[in-house]
Each structure stands twice: as C-alpha cells, then as structure tokens.
Amino acid sequence: MMTRSRHLVWVALFACAGAGPVAGQDGFGAAVLAPAPDEILVLKPAFGRGAASVLVFERGGSGWSQVQELWSAGSLLGESFGRTMAPVEGGFLAASGDPQVMIGAYGFARGADGAWAESGALPLRAEAAASAEEMSMGRVMAILQPPARVVAADGDVALVSAPGGQGAGTEVRIYARGADGTWSAAGALEAGDLRANARYGAAMAVRGGLAAVGAPGQGSSGTVYLFARGADGGWTRQAALATPALGGGAGLGSSVLFTGDDELAVGAPSADGSVGRVVLFARGPGGGWSETAILLPSAPGSGQRFGTALAAAGDELIVGAPGAEDGRGRVDAFTRVDADGGWRAAHAFAPGEAGLVAGFGSALALRPGLAVVGSPASEGSAGLAAVYEAAEDGSWSGPVWLRAGAPPVAVTSAEVRCEDDRAAGFDCADVDLQAYLPLASIGAEPGERVSDAWGWTDPETGREYGLVGRSGGAAIVDVTDAVNPVYLGVIPANRSGARDLKVYADHLFFTGDGAGAHGLVVFDLTRLRDVADPPVEFAPDLRWDGIGSAHNLIIDTGAGTAFTVSTSGDGHTCGGGLVMIDIRQPLAPEFAGCYTDTEGLIFQGRTHDAQCLVYDGPDMDYRGRELCFASNETALRIVDVTDKSDPRPISAAAYPGVAYIHQGWLSDDRRYFFLDDELDELVGTTDRTKTIVWDVTDLDDPVVIADYYGPNNATDHNLYVKGDRMYQANY
C-alpha cells in the first residue's frame, strides 16, 4: 500500500500553468470565422492559459456557449498558431506557428456527427532545417516569436505565406486539395523583384481563379499583386496595384478582400498618420484593374488603423479600426449603393462600456445577420470576441462577449485528494490540492497576470502568508489555514508583467520589470498582524529609487544584501549584472556596488538570476565568503562579492548544447547546484524537461555530473531545494 508524505507546498497557480516567456497573453480573437448562422470559431493563437487552440461556439436557447476546443498536433506540443484562419468547403485552415517552420497550416474538418477534428497539415518542408548556429538572440526570438505564416483559401485552393522565398524573405505557396481531402504543394506565386521588408504575403485572398497578395512594404505606399489561374491550372501575375497618393508608408496591402468576382478591397491602415484608408479596385471590361474609390473612417481621430481587417457578406462590408477611440477600437460598416462599386457608410460597431477592451476590430467575420469582431489585445491580451446580431428591421444588437473558457472557480474549504490523476480539474500525481484561488479572488482585474510568489511566516504568531506578484502590485494571502486562504490585500506598484519578491528581516522587497521608475518597494510585514476588514490597499513603507525596473531580485539573508539583475531604466543598472544593495536597515537601503559579467545572450553582461549566500559549503577556500551563483544566460558564473567594491569572479562553466541558463539552486549541503536551461526543450536539444546537476565541491572547477529527465516535454523555468526535495515550476 502506498503512503504519502504530507509536505505542504504553497504554489502560485493563479496564472494557470503554461505561461511562456513571451506567450503569457493568449490573443483570443486574433482570427474569427462564422461558418454557419449558429456557429462561431475563435482563434487563441498562444499558449498563455492552456494550449493554443480554436474554440467553437454555438448559439442555443440561452445564447452563445463554447461547445468544443480544437488543437493541432503542434499546439499539443506547446507550439503556437499563426494569427489567421481561412474557411474551405467542409472545414477551415489555421496558420501554423511552429518554430521550425515545417508546417504552413493545419486543416480541420467537420465529421459526420457535426464535431470538428484535425484533418491534416499543409507542409512547408519534410524536416526541420539543420542549424549549426550557436544560440543567439535572433534564434531565441525565432523560437519565442516564430516566423509568421498567413493562410487564405477558396474551394480547393489554399495559399500560405511563410519565410524562405524571394529576396524579401517570404514566399507564397500554392496548395491543392485532392479528392481524398489531403493538401499537396502546387507551386508558388512569384511577384518578381521585391525589396527588403516588402512583407510579401502579409495578407492574401483567393476567389475563383484570382489571388491577391499584399506587400505593404513594397513601393512607397504598399502594393498588392494580382495573379490569375490559367486553363492549365498554372498561376501568372496579372497586375501590381498601388496608390501612391496615399503617401509613404501607408501599408497598402495589410488586408485584402474580394468583395465580388471583379472587385477588391485593400486596407492601408498606416495611411494619413495611421488614420487609415481602404482602397477599392475593380476589373474593367478589358481585364485591367483600376482604383474606383477610397473609404474613410466614420469618425475623425489619429492612430485608428482603419483598414486593419476586412469582411464582407452580400452588399455589406465591415472595416476594422482597432486603434480608434484611444485604442479601444471600432468597426465601420458600409453598404453597397450601386452596381458600379459605390459604397456608403451605414453604421458602426463599438465595444460599448465594457472594461479593458483594446484592439477591437483586429479581426472580423460577417455573414447575413451576424458579425463577429476579434479584440485580441483586450483584458491584458487574454483577448475577447464580440458578437452582433441583426433584427428583421436591420437594427443590430450587441455586443455579446465571448472568452476563452469559463472563468476559473475557487477551490476552498476542504482538501481535494488526487484521485485518478485529477484533483478539482487539475492534473496531479501523489499531490493533493489544499486550495486554489483564481486571479479574481486575489483582487486582480481582467487581464492581470501573476509572475512570482514567495512566503513569510510570522515569527511571533506563526501565521503563514503567501506573497504574490500580480501585474498591479504584490498581493498578500493568509494561508495559515491551508484550505481556507484569505486574501488580505495588495501593495500597489507600477504595472509589470514580471515581478520578483523576497523577504528579509520581516520585510517584503519586490521589483517590477519593464515598469519604468518602479524602484525597490519595501513593506513591513508585521503590519499584517492587525488587518481590519480585508481586503485592503496597503501603502508601501518605502520605494527606493536607486533602481528603476528589474527582472529578478535576490536576497542574501545571511549578509543582508539584496541584488537586482537585468536592471533597466533610471538609477543603477550595472550593465544588466548584479546591482548590490545593503538592506541591513530595511527601510534605509544603500547602493553597495556592481558586478558586470562578460557572459550573456540577450546582451553581454546580463545576469538573469542568481542565488547569493554566505558560503558554508565544502570548499574551505571560500568558507565564510559571500558568493553568488549567477545564471548568466550562457554560463553559470560563481562570483565572490564579499568586497562590494571589488567583486571577484571565481569560475564560469557551461555545457554542450547550452541554450539559455535561466536559474538554479544549491543543495542544502552546498555540494550540488541544480540548474534549469529554459530553452533547451524549445530548441530541441532535449525532448523532455532536463535538470542539469553540477558538482560544486570545488568552486574553481564546477563539473556537470548528471542530467535528470522529467516525464514530459515541459520547459523548465524555476526550481528551489529544501531538504531532500526539489520543487520545480515548469511550463
């Protein structure tokens, strides 16, 4: 019979497992489709909260509800989708976002039972391109923000734009669907000479035997290339459309849409200082194309980006302006007034009074009586989609807001045992759930996220507190009664997506990255002994302005030294290395010194994280010295910082296949250092979570002695060691 050791672990699950380094924002609403009057598809291209997916909504007696979630083979492995979808007969295509750029798009088809399922992929190449290139920032960004792919389709023809062709860096590939439903490569659409940054294939459309490919960076104002399919099935370039009168940098071709067999609408969202325009073109009797009209936004204002997205149904055309209304967004509707391509402004869709809406109009879908508007930047880029419906008299109602999944529900009052590998909806193995508080339960507004957690035990009362880094500050939760946690309040600070929190001498210290003049915030935790009527907003005891923003914070509690790393903005930065701060008097910090390394990936000298302590390990040469074990992106660096005016590097070590040395922690006896490399899983140098074990008994010569492989391919992020147990946070 199996028995369990009862170790209580308080984990910051508030953000939900899976937030990647760049993809903490899901972007739900980046693309939308309405394949049927009572059905809507919404793309969630990133994996901030669960795998990237397409969510299916149906209209029932009680309104719109999610009925299915679709994943690709790639998204189930942690890959993103692109940001476009295209309908095809019996299904749709969703652009891929795999970092290896092996897949152009994934196909989905409706089964006999009406449910959707993946139906195959449109491959770009058979295997990933081999690369002998060492890890660089360029490779990192290609992994974290994979090259964009765009998909368009009509009938049995699909177009995919992807990196790799022509001098401008992209190519547009043609795919044909066979009788068995599989897609195969059928050539490419070649525009001819393209300049660098033409962004060829940024937007595409297909209708019958015509294809339109936008290149918003080509020429002075952007260009759209038109191709026609011949009797032999081959495609030839027919025209290059431009409107120089729009002015330089207009971005013509950022969106394209056939509004008829001989009509084309083209967005130029950067025209006129990013107010935006939509240019209408028509094919004449002789086969030539010419400009027929230019559509303007329904209201004045700069930065509207009118023309970012287009959708049409019958004699209705809608145009997205996601920058309108101070970034909230708007969608303008137009009605055809004559057969010669004339359009008039009809009405506008607005997000109403809903809070935290941003980028409304970034994606559109339209069918008679139904409009769907994507708003992927809303709620902190978690994303929203809005549904509008028309009455018989032509009036529109809405919005009805769609979100990715039901809001999480708090789990409190009683322990939930792990049974059949599940506990209250979470996967588990030999770990029972004491409680779960979603973001809303710790005071977070929609769109906030959580990026770090620490803890404090009151030495007088024995009460335990969780300290949680929220976008809007540091949230404090009393976890003394583990199954009944109580949210006490928040210490507000400049908004940040990446915080670090540590405790010294009964004081909380925390930082924020990318948060301007955030400073080092200090809060006396003994104030928690008498909190009336929680939750409350706590005023910090100090904001030390010796630094601006910082990615991570380390505290050596033995020496009373704080270290910020990857520090930026005003104040001390130390080139991204160790900013040393004397905090022996918590409310009177003093700058103590700098250490800037020669290692680094994002830039030379950048330290990502560290563990610093008064060394009490086996290497007698350094006993009693204050040392930092620094994760410096490309190497593990051990530094003697006892003399803050003259820190001395002791050693640096790496290993074959290093991708990004992120963080690590010493064993309690100081003989071993356990390290996580954040990117090795993502770049493919390991197929499972790998923890690297160093023998550091000789600090002058650290040696890798083992690798521990986890049971899945999650990316390792942070780990801590207490006694004979290691606690890892992976995504």
Please describe what each predicted stretch is.
Residues 2-9:
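Bacterial N-terminal signal peptides that target proteins for export
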Residues 1-2, 24:
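Initiator methionine at the very start of the polypeptide chain
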Residues 10-18:
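Bacterial N-terminal signal peptides
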Residues 22-731:
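Feature marking well-ordered beta-strand scaffolds used for ligand recognition
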